[in-house]
Structures are given as C-alpha cells and as structure tokens.
Amino acid sequence: GGNRKAPAAPALSAFEQAATAAGLTAAPGKSAVENRYRGSVEGKTADTRFTGSLDMDAAFKQAEPEANRWDFGIGMRKPGKQEFAVWVEPHSASSLGEVKTILAKLDWLQGKLDQPEFRQLKALTDACAAQGHRRFHWMATARVGIRPGSREANMLAARGLNPPSTRVVI
C-alpha cells in the first residue's frame, strides 16, 4: 500500500503568500524581526496573531547595498478581521537628522510596494489602514529626541508616521 497521502502542509497565511509572490521568503510569526526588537512589537489584545514576517533589509542588502532600506514587514490578524501587514523600522531617534533617513527608508519601501510583484503585500498594507491602524512604524532604539508637535513630528505625520516610539502596539 504505497498509496498513503503525505500529511497536508499547513495553509500559508496571506502574508506568506504575498511574500512568496514578491520573491521573498517569510519567516514564521515575528521571527524575522531581530531578537532584541521582537518583544517590542505586540498586539493590543492577546488574541492578535502574527502570521509571518520579512527582513527586507537582509533580503535587499546585496542587490541594493547603498539604499536606505526599510527593515521589517509583519503579517497580523485580529479575530474576525482580515489579515494585514505592518512595517516596522527600528532606528535611532536621538537626533532630528534621523527624520530624513527614516523618510528615505519609507520612500524605498513604498517604491517596492508599488512594484507589480509586491501587489499582494501592498493590498495587505492597505488592509492595515482600512482597519484603522498605522501602516508604518518608527521604533526608537534608544532615547527619543523628536517632540510631538515639532516640525519633524509634523513631517513624519504628513507621511503617515507617528513620532518614534520604543514600542509598537497594534
């Protein structure tokens, strides 16, 4: 009886499928996020699921060594809701000059999301906004030197970013 079926592989999440379509390999849960930052990305409720993650920086480092690359994409799902993607960039926020770097990284990421092979990741990113969440997050790696209401904070807000924060809670 060599007719036994192999056990079915677990169904890929929408985030994992979207990553594959973009030619990338998603890691399970939040595991693509560097260990020291992983615990600082959390769901507002305990039943939030992390459906996959991408290390964009590592994926494009060789092809685009000089680019200001965004770091991490994370798939999330809340009960009864559509899966969505958020993008997290751990980066120093100690000086105002870092704002330009973050905005350059955001330009890079949005350029990727506009490419045809990233269409599914863009749709998941749009689903994030449709559920009332910020799509892009600057995670401060230390002291935050950017004050709410400052010119720099306003520049970030104009691009859909909150001022940097040491935790990302969605």
Which residue ranges define each predicted feature?
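Conserved alpha/beta core surface patches that mediate binding of polyanionic ligands
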Residues: E66-W70, L109
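Ser/Thr/Pro-rich, acidic low-complexity intrinsically disordered regulatory segments
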Residues: A67, R77-P79
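Short, basic/hydrophobic alpha-helical segments
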Residues: Q110-A130
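Mg2+/Mn2+-dependent nuclease catalytic core
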Residues: S94-L113
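Short acidic, S/G/P-rich loop/turn micro-motifs used as interaction or catalytic elements
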Residues: F60-E64, S92-G97, R143-P148
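Domain-level recognition of nuclease-like catalytic cores that cleave nucleotide substrates
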Residues: A123-I170
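Acidic-basic catalytic patches of nuclease active cores, encompassing PD-(D/E)XK
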Residues: G1-P65
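Conserved catalytic cores of phosphodiester-cleaving nucleases, focusing on short active-site segments
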Residues: F72-I74, F84-S95
